[in-house]
């Protein structure tokens, strides 16, 4: 128990003078090296690079042992709360090493037989999953959403391990992310599950992520739906019983399950729908008592969620469309990737928004392209994160169609793709 509490203390934000720095070590899938040997080699690597600037990744190593056994060493999450990257003196920090290997099997389906039908009720991943690698870093938000969610879950686990009386201080291990479609709510839930599995790898051997298909749990015979919910949660309970696993239950578009109560009151749904709502709430109440489970939920239509469900959520976080500043970061990461793959060639240095601020947004040879990207970001406001990540592909497909392009040519194409996106939205709205 003391070791578990110690792991959690290390993973929580450090209040002491010596700040905690999290270092994620991705061990190669074929490697059988002992974690202790990898740990010592990584410590030597960090000693050789005493000062780093913000988040930093090593993929090439001087030591042959690291080259054979480690894919990457990453200093992570130093920029979640700081507005800008800061220099970090590793010798003055408490290093929290998290060594992990990715599961490459992909998702499996959890089926529930309902008479002659075979209902896919959930998708199931063993974490950390290769499918979600890099997802956390790709999600850009204006406020400290990611750090708040990390801190929340770490605190719930610490309170459980310290045996805090839940009758005196209540926490439910339920997170609700709400906001318009396409803002990355589901992706954030999956990325959070992956991040926590890695961060607590010394405490739990692996993670389990169950994404419940809330639409499938509604049988066309409402009287059967309550039974399906119970069946589904019985399978989840089996996973929770393994105390070496950290279990995440993701219920996407939770309003489709919980809106039934209000519809029933209005006479629009059969009374059996109430049983489904009650079954969901009862099952959540049962599994949330376990210290190794976190329930993650999303909703596109907040006002349609059952009040009894909303009350159970400890954190109700709104996830809105990205601001111009967040859009700039998203586009910048896309351009970096295209330059790395030499679709944009030759490579050119782009300034960050902070660097543009420092020079007063004055246009010169160094800042010209970055200012153009800033302008494109401003006119992209109103588009969802999902659409923004597609736009570089659409820009190339619609306006370039060549193996490589200069960054000037690509930015022109990106600007046209943004204009086209708003035109299409306008046409769709006119026909709705």
From Swiss-Prot:
For this UniProt record, the keywords arranged alphabetically read as follows: Acetylation, ATP-binding, Differentiation, Meiosis, Nucleotide-binding, Oogenesis, Spermatogenesis
- A cellular component annotation (GO) from this entry: male germ cell nucleus
Q: Which residues bind ATP?
A: 179-186
Q: SMART domains from the xrefs?
A: AAA
Report whether Ligase shows up as a keyword of the record.
no
Say if the entry is tagged with keyword Ligase. Answer: no
Q: Name one GO molecular function term.
A: ATP binding
Q: Which residues carry this modification: N-acetylmethionine?
A: 1
The GO biological-process annotations, alphabetized, read as:
double-strand break repair; female meiosis I; male meiosis I; meiotic recombination checkpoint signaling; mitotic spindle assembly checkpoint signaling; oocyte maturation; oogenesis; reciprocal meiotic recombination
Coiled-coil features, chain-numbered ranges: none
Query: Which Pfam families does the record cross-reference, listed alphabetically?
Result: AAA, AAA_lid_TRIP13_C, TRIP13_N
Briefly state the protein's biological role. Answer: Plays a key role in chromosome recombination and chromosome structure development during meiosis. Required at early steps in meiotic recombination that leads to non-crossovers pathways. Also needed for efficient completion of homologous synapsis by influencing crossover distribution along the chromosomes affecting both crossovers and non-crossovers pathways. Also required for development of higher-order chromosome structures and is needed for synaptonemal-complex formation. In males, required for efficient synapsis of the sex chromosomes and for sex body formation.
* Family classification: Belongs to the AAA ATPase family. PCH2 subfamily.
Provide the assembly information.
Answer: Specifically interacts with the ligand binding domain of the thyroid receptor (TR). This interaction does not require the presence of thyroid hormone for its interaction. Interacts with proteasome subunit PSMA8; to participate in meiosis progression during spermatogenesis.
Q: What is this protein called?
A: Pachytene checkpoint protein 2 homolog
Identify the coding gene. Trip13
